Amino acid sequence: MVDKQRTLPELLAPAGDMERLKMAVLYGADAVYLAGTDFGMRAFAGNFDPDELKAAVAYAHAHNVRVHCTINTMPRGDEIVRLPAHLERLNDAGVDAVIVADLGAFTLAGKYAPNCQRHISTQASISNYVTANAWYDLGASRVILARELSLEEIRTIRENTPAELEIEAFVHGAMCVSYSGRCLLSNYMTGRDASRGACAQPCRYHYALMEEKRPGEYFPIEEDEKGSYILNSRDMCMIDHLDDLLDVGLSSLKIEGRAKSAYYAAIVTGAYRHCLDDAAAGRPIDPVWRDEVEHVSHRPYATGFYYGYPGQYYENSRYIREWQVV
């Protein structure tokens, strides 16, 4: 049972557009994360133009919800020159924090968005306390850890970093087969750059083996006649393990899914909100909320790397869609 005196972490929900932002806010998010039309890792999420961003911040703040804006691509020289103006717009709109991965973007954020906290993206692959402390010394107020860490590794980071440094981790949603999204497959195979939010997800393709001297003959790795899903990942779901997440001292629990539906934003945010509130009150988790996250479109659930190295899911990459919104 969770100590009801324990400080609850922030519940951070995705907001791909205004409709999804409203769902996340109304269903209990403490904060939302979104992107402008540039510099975000979800190019097809909808995102917010400058006027929409102002309206989004105003709506969230009216409900006492914080807004974090992603600038977590790795900008090239022709892109970085546009970043100061973008940062100034975020600062003027009242965005609470910017999420960055590139050191240059981090530096510019300190200059052009002084009212915004600087959070270090999972794209930076922070996996140890030395790296976390280095970012803190540079002025970061939060680090978003690599998804590949176990609970014990997170505990070690928390025990060896200043209490003022907030630590955020993903607890629900899609996972990348590459190390915290650092994947070149999409760029190589389709020309769509994953580091600029345009990943084509070739890890979800149907693969088979072909022997060099037998072109055209394909050998399934598993029994699936379409080939094996050798790079495929399950989706993360930690709703049954909130006690363990709270024990390691996380400051923020993050839900993946800016490209997902408004229904997803509502159901998943609401389920985690109720479970966290139950934890705060010392109540056992009601299994109805675990059932709720089964109602959204998802791949088979797993706990990621939190309890060690996960097994591979070879069967297929299809979403489970057993429920419809009416």
Model-flagged regions — what are they?
Residues 1-26, 31-34, 38, 63-73, ...:
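Surface-exposed amphipathic alpha-helical tracts and adjacent flexible/coil segments at the periphery
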Residues 39-41, 58-60:
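Long C-terminal interaction/binding lobes of large macromolecular proteins
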Residues 45-54:
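Aromatic- and glycine-enriched glycan-recognition loops and surfaces
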Residues 69-70, 100, 120-122:
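Short beta-strand elements of ligand-binding domains
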Residues 81, 116-129:
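Gly/Gly-Pro- and Ser/Thr-rich, intrinsically disordered tail segments characteristic of DNA damage-repair
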Residues 104-105:
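Alpha-helix capping/helix-boundary segments
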Residues 113:
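Conserved phosphotransfer cores of two-component systems
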